[in-house]
């Protein structure tokens, strides 16, 4: 499995290259239709997730530990966590979701993340789990209130 890290090249090979014949023949409407249909889910959301993972390094002073690795996690049953960071010395596990969608993120996303975090086997019997949620359109007041009550949740817009 390989991944092109340059977002412009990703865009080119995902949208331009497969549609060259339409573009060259002047059928821009077909290309634009495909772009509108797939641009957010098949390009922007992945770019946003990568930006969120990079942002974790900038948020290092938010948590009372320093993590060693930042990446993502998935298992054989297609469960996925957008952001995962570990602190091997202290047994801290940071998990996060990145939501690039219309509307605010609610408690349901946090609950789903909490369930997925329990599936992670890393240091399972001796760890502290921290949560971070990223959203381009904010959070519900219910989730903001819960985050204010708990020190293990960080919300970022």
Stretches found by the model and what they are:
Residues 70-75, 96-108:
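Acidic/glycine-enriched edge-of-secondary-structure segments
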Residues 125-157:
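Domain-level recognition of nuclease-like catalytic cores that cleave nucleotide substrates
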């Amino acid at each position: 499995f390989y991944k092109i890290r340059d977002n412009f090249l990703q865009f080119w090979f995902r949208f331009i290259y497969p549609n060259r014949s339409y573009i060259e023949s002047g059928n821009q409407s077909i290309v634009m239709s495909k772009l509108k249909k797939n641009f957010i889910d098949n390009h922007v959301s992945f770019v946003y997730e990568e930006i969120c993972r990079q942002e974790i390094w900038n948020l290092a002073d938010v948590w009372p530990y320093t993590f060693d690795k930042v990446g993502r996690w998935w298992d054989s049953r297609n469960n996925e966590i957008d952001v995962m960071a570990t602190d091997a010395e202290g047994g801290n596990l940071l998990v996060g979701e990145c939501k690039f969608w219309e509307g605010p993120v609610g408690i349901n996303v946090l609950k789903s993340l909490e369930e997925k975090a329990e599936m992670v086997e890393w240091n399972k019997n001796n760890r502290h789990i921290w949560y971070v949620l990223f959203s381009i359109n904010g959070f519900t007041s219910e989730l903001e209130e819960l985050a204010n009550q708990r020190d293990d949740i960080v919300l970022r817009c």
